[in-house]
Curated annotation (Swiss-Prot):
UniProt feature coiled coil, ranges: none
UniProt cross-references to SUPFAM superfamilies, sorted A to Z: D-ribose-5-phosphate isomerase (RpiA), lid domain (SSF75445), NagB/RpiA/CoA transferase-like (SSF100950)
NCBIfam families associated with the record: PRK00702.1, rpiA
Pfam families: Rib_5-P_isom_A
UniProt-recorded name of the protein: Ribose-5-phosphate isomerase A
Gene Ontology terms: cellular component: cytosol
Length: 260
């Protein structure tokens, strides 16, 4: 790795490194998508190489699968392994009960499928993602291409009847074109400002024709690992009801970090 890490990269680095500590030999592990998850994949590859671990990975996106294979991790499909011991992923927001908004990286559908098919979900993040109430980060909704504008209108009309602060729905763009997911769908980002009842919002969205899935991850996350720029991490375990601090060594010197 060249140069000094920025404070935010240092926070992501230590969160990802600590989360890899949950992985044990012989596990089937789900690999998340996004900038923080990419740090985790690199840490995992380094740990597997140094400790001679035998693990099987399932990726939540094409780009995560490519990174993992480049780093010599064994990547297979969810259909092949059927169920996972652990999934490690990032989040765009999390609240005090560890409910999440995910999908900023465009992989929410596969991320939710993989996380739901896991015994445990570990989320790696930094303190900026902690909120009292979900909704400041736009909520991604994956929609079928056919009739997407009608679907967007239905979404906005439906939001009139739920407890949210805003209703603007914007098609996600990339390089001047609609962003296309790995499944060939579009994403509509909902600028809700505040989600008073996440369960209600998730339920009504997924009942609409044309909606594939939304980025609310409710009762899925077990542990959040919050990285900090001083090299410390905070672990919040929703099942144990515990919160504790640890210090993580920051030494990004392995070959898996050489291109950063």
């Amino acid at each position: 790795m060249s140069g000094e890490m920025s404070p935010i990269d240092r926070a992501k680095y230590v969160a990802a490194k600590r989360a890899v500590g949950f992985v044990e030999d012989g596990m089937r592990v789900g690999l998340g998508t996004g900038s923080t998850a990419a740090w985790m994949v690199r840490h995992l590859a380094e740990t597997v190489d140094q400790e001679g671990m035998d693990i099987t990975c399932v990726a939540t996106s094409t780009r995560t699968a490519e990174l993992a294979r480049d780093l010599k991790l064994h990547v297979t499909t969810l259909d092949e392994v059927k169920w996972l011991d652990l999934t490690i992923d990032g989040a765009d927001e999390f609240d005090p009960t560890l409910n999440l908004i995910k999908g900023g990286g465009g992989a929410l559908l596969q991320e939710k499928i993989v996380a739901t098919a896991s015994d445990r979900m570990i989320v790696i993040t930094d303190a900026s993602k902690a909120v009292a109430t979900l909704g400041a980060f736009p909520l991604p909704v994956e929609v079928i291409r056919f009739g997407w504008e009608t679907t967007r209108t239905l979404i906005e009309e439906t939001l009139v009847n739920v407890d949210v602060g805003g209703r603007e729905a914007i098609l996600r763009m990339e390089n001047g074109m609609p962003y296309v997911t790995d499944e060939g769908n579009f994403i509509v980002d909902l600028h809700l400002e505040r989600i008073g009842n996440p369960r209600q919002v998730s339920l009504v969205l997924n009942q609409l024709p044309g909606v594939v899935e939304n980025g609310l991850f409710l009762d899925i996350c077990d542990v959040v690992v919050i990285g900090k720029s001083d090299g410390s991490v905070e672990l919040r375990d929703i099942n144990e009801g515990s919160v504790h601090q640890e210090q993580v060594e920051v030494t990004a010197t392995g070959n898996v970090f050489s291109d950063l």
